[in-house]
């Protein structure tokens, strides 16, 4: 029954409205500093990329803001006719052989180019037409010979331009050439790393970082600056109805898109509204992994959570033993990635060894994933312990035995129960405790699986006691709400500091 979910949604709406009303204090001077920091990084990235593009493409002009021209650099080819290109591919029915043949027949290889001054306009890009009487018009016109650039670009046929990647399947075809989305660039970066293509790795890293910095400047720096009210507060809008899994999304700006981890400089601009106040973040430890351990009843996962096994150190050890030295911090990016559908494909051999090891180590999770797939095939839907249902009416089994929508089938139950059920019910519990104790400290945001509290300078110890009380009650709250025996420990870890970024663990 969805009765419990509806009740939780309605109850949470009240507390999200309170979060919006309270607002989150913003240091505008610090925000300007972050803007300058990102802008300087962006300028350097553009310079570095332009220098690298010059080496890869010769004098051929490339606009970094154009996905089409970026694809020229990456794939070293372009469609003969863009008008018919996108209609050539059916990613669901086209075989790999037909795809490769279609690409060969409908693209041309790009070569490095040499720029020579246009003799028609003498490099000015402008010409003056001649009147019938032989005199020149006073007004200039664009030179059509060089398209007003002042240069003619001549192919150097002995040197293919770009990184020379091949787009592997028809799903990589885009309207203007080939895909340059974030996930595709990450995949190609992994391939480049495997093949020792260091220049390609560096180029793709820079392109992805430039895209990220542009997003940070527009979505966060500009977004925060635009939506901060005259009282110096950003009133965080948290929405329950935009995501498939029920987890919260945001608007004006979407704070839920804030990168994970403790290094994102935008977090530094958020401070307490009180002089001497602090910001506390109560973060669930490995929440989605713990939920997956419970839902799958994987004995290894449950044992590791219960005993406090350091999974990140284990990840680092596996990858290092396979020949690629890796720190614990670096390993965090890999530890739970297989849980969300990531594989070793396109990664270094040492990293791929860990992804293979994950499947073997947590065989119970893998078995549960297969059970979910069978449930979706049989009923067209899957369920979570809270009563939420996810419909997959078009799910089928492919000829090779794999199941369509498998990534969503694996991810939705974990993400939904963790972030759409456990986090909200915990937020409500903590918010009620703060109010019941008539405290000025208040919840001002929640991102991913954390709860952010603006702590009054006289209430730090009281807030810590409330977080401790929540930890003691988490399992009881979850079990009582949904009639479960949640046999995996849940833990909120608190950090506190003068702003949202510069926080330290609370002993």
In which residue ranges do the predicted regions lie?
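A common structural junction motif
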Residues: 469-481
């Amino acid at each position: 029954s969805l009765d419990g979910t509806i009740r939780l949604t309605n109850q949470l709406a009240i507390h999200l409205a309170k979060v919006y009303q309270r607002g989150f204090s913003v240091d505008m001077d610090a925000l300007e500093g972050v803007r300058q920091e990102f802008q300087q990084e962006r300028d350097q990235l553009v310079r570095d990329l332009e220098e690298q593009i010059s080496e890869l493409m010769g004098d051929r002009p490339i606009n970094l803001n154009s996905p089409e021209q970026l694809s020229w650099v990456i794939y070293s080819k372009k469609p003969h006719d863009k008008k018919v290109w996108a209609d050539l591919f059916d990613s669901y029915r086209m075989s790999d052989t037909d795809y490769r043949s279609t690409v060969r027949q409908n693209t041309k290889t790009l070569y490095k180019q040499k720029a020579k001054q246009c003799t028609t306009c003498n490099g000015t890009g402008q010409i003056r037409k001649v009147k019938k009487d032989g005199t020149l018009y006073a007004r200039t016109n664009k030179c059509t010979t060089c398209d007003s650039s002042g240069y003619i670009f001549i192919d150097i046929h002995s040197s293919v331009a770009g990184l020379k990647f091949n787009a592997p399947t028809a799903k990589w075809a885009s309207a203007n050439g080939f895909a340059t989305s974030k996930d595709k660039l990450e995949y190609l970066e992994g391939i480049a790393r495997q093949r020792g293509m260091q220049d390609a790795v560096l180029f793709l890293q820079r392109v992805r970082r430039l895209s990220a910095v542009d997003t940070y400047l527009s979505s966060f720096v500009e977004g925060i600056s635009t939506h901060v009210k005259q009282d110096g507060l950003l009133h965080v809008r948290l929405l329950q109805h935009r995501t498939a899994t029920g987890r919260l999304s945001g608007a004006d700006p979407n704070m839920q898109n804030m990168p994970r981890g403790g290094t994102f400089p935008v977090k530094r601009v958020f401070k307490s509204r009180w002089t001497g106040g602090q910001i506390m973040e109560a973060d669930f430890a490995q929440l989605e992994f713990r939920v997956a351990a419970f839902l799958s009843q994987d004995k290894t996962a449950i044992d590791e959570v219960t005993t406090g096994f350091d999974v990140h150190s284990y990840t680092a050890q596996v990858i290092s033993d396979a020949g690629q030295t890796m720190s614990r911090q670096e390993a965090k990016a890999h530890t739970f990635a297989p849980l969300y559908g990531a594989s070793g494909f396109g990664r270094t051999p040492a990293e791929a060894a860990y992804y293979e090891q994950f499947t073997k180590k947590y065989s119970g999770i893998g078995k549960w994933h297969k059970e979910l797939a069978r449930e979706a095939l049989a009923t067209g839907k899957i369920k979570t312990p809270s009563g939420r249902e996810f419909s997959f009416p078009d799910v089928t089994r492919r000829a090779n035995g794999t199941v369509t929508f498998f990534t969503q089938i694996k991810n939705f139950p974990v993400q939904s129960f963790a972030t759409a059920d456990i986090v909200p019910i915990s937020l409500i519990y903590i918010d009620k405790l703060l109010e019941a104790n008539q405290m000025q400290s208040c919840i001002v945001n929640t991102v991913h699986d954390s709860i952010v509290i603006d702590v009054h300078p006289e209430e730090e110890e009281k807030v810590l006691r409330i977080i401790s009380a929540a930890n003691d009650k988490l399992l009881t709250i979850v079990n009582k709400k949904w009639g479960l025996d949640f046999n995996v420990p849940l833990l909120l870890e608190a950090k506190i500091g003068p702003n949202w970024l510069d926080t330290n663990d609370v002993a």
